[in-house]
Curated annotation (Swiss-Prot):
This is Elongator complex protein 3. InterPro entries: Acyl_CoA_acyltransferase (IPR016181), ELP3 (IPR039661), ELP3-like (IPR034687), ELP3-like_N (IPR056591), Elp3/MiaA/NifB-like_rSAM (IPR006638), GNAT_dom (IPR000182), Radical_SAM_C (IPR032432), rSAM (IPR007197). Expressed in meristematic tissues of in roots, leaves, seedlings, cotyledons, floral buds and shoot apices. Expressed in the shoot meristem and the emerging leaves immediately after germination. In the root, expressed in the transition zone and the upper meristematic zone. Acetyl-CoA binds at residues 182, 492-495, 515-517, 548. The keyword Cell membrane does not apply. Pfam families: Acetyltransf_1 (PF00583), ELP3_N (PF23613), Radical_SAM (PF04055), Radical_SAM_C (PF16199).
């Protein structure tokens, strides 16, 4: 209960413990906070030793009420107070957003400096729905971003310095209790490959230097030091467009250490690409997919339902074609429902009544139906943009669209079988289910003028994915000399579960338990006996090259290569 005290002849009301103040007891607010943190950590240790359930929220609430704290201690403060002897046991209880490293990798998103969209020179304008960029209402933001997304705000605080962005984000994830031994960079902020070569080299060099701590003179030196750093760069993703994903661009991205491309497709209809001012054809998308996959890259496509002049039936047909046509069949997908944002051409159409978004409930139904079509070899990375809702004039109204769509699928008796939903780490976090009987599963399909084999270790009864490998028998679009002739290429090897250091082992975790080696052995067998290849290449992250050396591979250009007997 609140109490009243006399101060300077006036009655002052004291807040109740936990209701905006802190109890006296001769403690300052800072001292009360320190004692509360100490008590929270001590209680967690005691309950852990007694094998009792550690309910962090209940423990925090009790301590805050006891010491009258209006604001609960931050996770980073509690993590810092953990004794070294208890960190391994209690860190999972304190880790913020465990999903961030559930796939075994800490993702670090960085942004290049704001620059104009390259197709303005040919089409005279940007895409009709695209916010951001130097000429927009959000002038200090990069193209297609508003400057208010979490990654954008971190980039602006760092003044778009790549080293500061990377180092500060890695340190932040570490403070939040995540393992940062394996890092994947995602380069966002418009068409990176359209920027001058000098700036691109500066940007990539600083990303690798942020891991190694070395100050490099060029990209080659930065990559060489990054290969031996304690924090490994196991992959790099670059956002690009089909017209900046040709042979010379692909070669340069391989030198950077890039392993995955995110390509803006948006629609499989030529008329929609023209009407929205994309600046490229859908045929160009299919061509660049062929080139990228034959160079070994993983390909993630961006698709946008609810574009102007499409409608529900055409949207569903577009996604059906995307998943079933050999011209597309990307390895990953980001679904970005169309948003109306101030300052875009679409905003003007919306203001005059010439464009209207799907109603929210209908959009949830559409996304649910799209997710039910996803084949088991495709990973759905995102289901909506992370643009803050107050900046959205019309479109998605809630920030948990994936969750709503999955709930709708349950209602309709549908199931999502994409890679992310079935990952062992995600299943463990969301459903507390672990794989029991794991077996090798093989799926073959044609895509982009080549033959794809998707190998995986799965618990087929519980539908849990433990690890995967993407093997491709190269088609006729090979541009890299290292892969010419009778050659197969491993485009991805990934074992899921909470991150374990590259040379480490943890009996309770799936990484480094031998699944990767078994997948590589099967891939080599298929390449030798079925593809009739005399060489197999791997597009390897810079920091994982030592792993492949132990399997008998050698560095040849940007690839790890092994000659098959």
């Amino acid at each position: 209960m609140a109490t009243a005290v006399v101060m300077n002849g006036e009655l002052k009301k004291q807040p109740r413990p936990g209701k905006g103040g802190y109890q006296g007891r001769g403690l300052t607010e800072e001292e009360a906070r320190v004692r509360a943190i100490s008590e929270i950590v001590s209680t967690m240790i005691e309950r852990s030793h007694r094998n009792e359930n550690v309910d962090l929220n209940a423990i925090k609430t009790a301590a805050c009420r006891k010491y009258g704290l209006a604001r609960a201690p931050k996770l980073v403060e509690m993590i810092a107070a953990l004794p070294d002897s208890e960190r391994e046991t209690l860190l999972p209880k304190l880790r913020a957003k465990p999903v961030r490293t559930a796939s075994g990798i800490a993702v670090v998103a960085v942004m290049s400096k704001p620059h104009r969209c390259p197709h303005i020179a040919t089409t005279g304008n940007i895409c009709v729905y695209c916010p951001g960029g130097p000429d927009s209402d959000f002038e200090y933001s990069t193209q297609s971003y508003t400057g208010y997304e979490p990654t954008s705000m971190r980039a602006i605080r760092a003044r778009y310095n790549p080293y500061v962005q990377a180092r500060s984000r890695i340190d932040q994830l570490k403070r939040l209790g995540h393992s940062v031994d394996k890092v994947e960079f995602i380069l966002m902020g418009g068409t990176f490959m359209s920027l001058p070569a000098e700036y691109r080299d500066f940007f990539i060099r600083n990303l690798h230097d942020a891991l190694s701590g070395h100050t490099s003179a060029n990209v080659e030196e930065a990559v060489a030091y990054s290969e031996h750093s304690a924090t490994k760069c196991i992959g790099m993703t670059i956002e690009t467009r089909p017209d900046y994903c040709l042979g010379p661009h692909l070669r340069q991205m391989l030198i950077y250490g890039c392993t995955r491309l995110e390509i803006g497709v948006q629609s499989t209809y030529e008329d929609v690409a023209r009407d929205t001012n994309r600046g490229h054809t859908v045929a160009a998308v299919a061509d660049c997919f062929c080139l990228a996959k034959d160079a070994g890259f993983k390909v993630v496509a961006h698709m946008m339902p609810d574009l102007p002049n499409v409608g529900v039936e055409r949207d569903m047909e577009s996604f059906k074609e995307f998943f079933e046509s050999p011209s597309f069949r990307a390895d990953g997908l980001k679904i970005y429902p169309t948003l109306v944002i101030r300052g875009t051409g679409l905003y003007e159409l919306w203001k005059t009544g010439r464009y209207r978004n799907y109603p929210p409930e209908q959009l949830v139904d559409i996304v649910a139906r799209i997710l039910s079509m996803v084949p088991p070899w495709t990973r759905v990375y995102r289901v909506q943009r992370d643009i803050p809702m107050p900046l959205v004039t019309s479109g998605v109204e809630k920030g948990n669209l994936r969750e709503l769509a999955l709930a709708r699928m349950d209602d309709l008796g549908l199931k999502c079988r994409d890679v992310r939903t079935r990952e062992a780490g995600i299943q463990d976090i969301h459903h507390k289910i672990k794989p029991e009987q794991v077996e090798l599963v093989r799926r073959d399909y044609t895509a982009n003028e080549g033959w794809e084999t998707f190998l995986s270790y799965e618990d087929t009864r519980q539908d849990i994915l433990v690890g995967l490998l993407r093997l491709r028998k190269c088609g006729k679009n090979v541009t890299c000399p290292e892969l010419m002739g009778k050659c197969s290429v491993v485009r991805e090897l990934h074992v899921y579960g909470t991150a374990v250091p590259v040379h480490g082992r943890d009996a309770d975790k799936l990484q480094h338990q031998g699944y990767g080696t078994l997948l590589m052995e099967e891939a080599e067998r298929i390449a030798r006996r079925e593809h009739r290849s005399n060489k197999i290449g791997v597009i390897s992250g810079v920091g994982t090259r030592h792993y492949y050396r132990k399997l008998g591979y050698e560095l040849e250009g940007p690839y790890m290569v092994k000659h098959l007997l």
